[in-house]
């Protein structure tokens, strides 16, 4: 039986660890070849080694356009084409209200989480036109609902959600689909570190279980399964979709 992503070439940013790593595993499992782009090259190489010959790693910081441009050129040279891009790289930023956020923190969040989508799209667009490909963005439920003491981060994810819809409208004429997944929470190294840095780590874990109506905070593989679906031909008539992968958190969300 043919796999859902058989023969697809997927560029995945932030694929070395966390949700990105789980997505890389899912894409390879479904038959894709994955080009992992990450600033942590050593971690990316370890992930590629685990995945085998169906993946390659490329070093770039998504907040720096030159690195993205160079990596995209290398990927196209190595693979010959590109069928999908998953903009997954991101950072969480400070736990404070907007007026306490420094300009440096604001700019870094915007560059990494949101402006990076602009740069990847700019450099991969011709290849996606040729392949009639797909773009997937990793957003967040907080981009839809807001969250206390995370205004700068929320702004980037809210912007990504609106951008996803606008891109879907712009690129439909090229048969390029654009969608987003919205986790509420998922245990990753980044979230583990964030939780550990809070005044009450045990309380944070209880909170993260509580906000999901299904009763637990998942691992990244549940996000990866949804992402693999949205990049597959099974989702061929889905574009502009902001898909909650949230265990129903939006139905009873507590800030």
Residue ranges and their predicted role:
Residues 180, 188, 202-234, 238, ...:
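C-terminal helical subdomain
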Residues 140:
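Residue(s) in the substrate-gating loop at a strand-loop-helix junction
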Residues 92-95, 145, 228, 239-255:
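Short C-terminal tail/terminal secondary-structure segment
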Residues 96-98, 102-108, 208:
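Substrate-binding pocket helix/loop in short-chain dehydrogenase/reductase
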Residues 121, 156, 164:
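Active-site helix of classical SDR
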Residues 172, 177, 238-240:
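Short, small/polar-rich loop/turn modules that mediate ligand/substrate recognition or access, typified
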Residues 126, 169-173:
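Alpha-helical segment proximal to the catalytic Tyr-Lys
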């Amino acid at each position: 039986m043919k796999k859902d992503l058989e023969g697809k070439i997927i560029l995945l940013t932030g694929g070395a660890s966390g949700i990105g790593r789980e997505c890389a595993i899912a894409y390879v499992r479904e038959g894709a070849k994955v080009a992992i782009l990450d600033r942590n090259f050593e971690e990316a190489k370890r992930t590629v080694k685990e995945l085998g010959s169906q993946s390659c790693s490329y070093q770039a910081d998504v907040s720096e356009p030159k690195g993205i441009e160079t990596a995209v050129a290398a990927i196209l040279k190595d693979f010959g084409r590109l069928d999908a891009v998953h903009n997954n790289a991101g950072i969480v930023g400070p736990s404070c209200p907007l007026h306490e956020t420094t300009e440096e923190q604001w700019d870094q969040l915007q560059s990494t989480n949101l402006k990076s989508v602009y740069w990847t799209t700019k450099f991969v667009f011709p290849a996606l036109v040729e392949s009639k490909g797909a773009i997937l963005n990793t957003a967040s439920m907080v981009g839809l609902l807001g969250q206390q003491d995370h205004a700068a981060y929320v702004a980037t994810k809210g912007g990504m959600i609106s951008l996803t819809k606008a891109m879907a409208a712009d690129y439909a004429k090229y048969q390029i689909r654009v969608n987003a997944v919205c986790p509420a929470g998922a245990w990753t190294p980044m979230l583990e570190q964030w939780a550990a840095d809070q005044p009450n780590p045990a309380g944070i874990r209880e909170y993260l279980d509580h906000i999901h109506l299904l009763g637990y905070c998942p691992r990244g593989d549940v996000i990866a399964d949804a992402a693999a679906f949205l990049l597959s031909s099974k989702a061929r008539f889905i574009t502009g979709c902001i898909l909650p992968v949230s265990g129903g958190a939006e139905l009873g969300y507590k800030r």
